[in-house]
């Protein structure tokens, strides 16, 4: 099912850890992109990034990355070409990725005077869970626990990215008919519910 939907694309699960939640004031401290390229070759990009500002204790207490951990690490401007190459034209999968991770990374590019990469399609597992009317809570940890996905290292970018990929695979099993169409239609349906064939293909349960 997923293979047919994503065949021919570079598919990457994406997650960030940051100094806070403000795209204007805060900065990235960890970025992970994990998945495979168009030929099925594995991709695992997981980097600690020097944010150039102090990391608040409250943030460090969540993701476990402290000021000492980022000393001597590359800043975002040093990795932006690599990140752009990975994200641009890829199918990006992530939890709350449309409202947090992608806007956050866009601001980092603008801050560096560069245009951000443009994914081919984005699958947000938070929106997907809501579209499928999965019971609350909808945070990544709770959804993974409910679907039998191990998230031992929650709030590390690599673990969260991998978990969102596995969660997507599990969620597709709940309404398989929803994913028997082009990925552009799937993306549209997840975000807007705007695919005309919803009622006939998925039934009234959605």
Predicted features and spans:
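Active-site phosphate/pyrophosphate-handling residues
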Residues: 103, 126, 162
């Amino acid at each position: 099912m997923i293979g047919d939907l994503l065949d021919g694309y570079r598919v990457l699960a994406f997650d960030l850890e940051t100094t806070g939640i403000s795209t204007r004031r805060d900065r990235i401290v960890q970025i992970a992109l994990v998945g495979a390229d168009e030929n099925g070759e594995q991709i695992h990009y997981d980097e600690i990034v020097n944010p150039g500002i102090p990391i608040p204790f409250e943030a460090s207490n969540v993701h476990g990355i402290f000021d000492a951990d980022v000393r001597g690490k590359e800043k975002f401007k040093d990795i932006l070409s690599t990140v752009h190459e990975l994200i641009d034209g890829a199918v990006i999968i992530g939890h709350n990725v449309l409202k947090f991770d992608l806007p956050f990374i866009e601001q980092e590019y603008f801050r560096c005077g560069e245009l951000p990469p443009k994914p081919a399609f984005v699958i947000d597992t938070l929106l997907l869970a809501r579209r499928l009317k999965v019971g609350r809570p909808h945070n990544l940890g709770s959804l993974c626990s409910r679907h039998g996905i191990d998230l031992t290292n929650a709030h590390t970018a690599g673990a969260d990215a991998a978990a969102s990929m596995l969660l997507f695979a599990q969620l597709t099993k709940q309404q398989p008919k929803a994913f028997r169409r082009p990925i552009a239609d799937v993306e549209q349906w997840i975000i807007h519910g705007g695919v005309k064939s919803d009622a006939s293909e998925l039934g009234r349960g959605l």
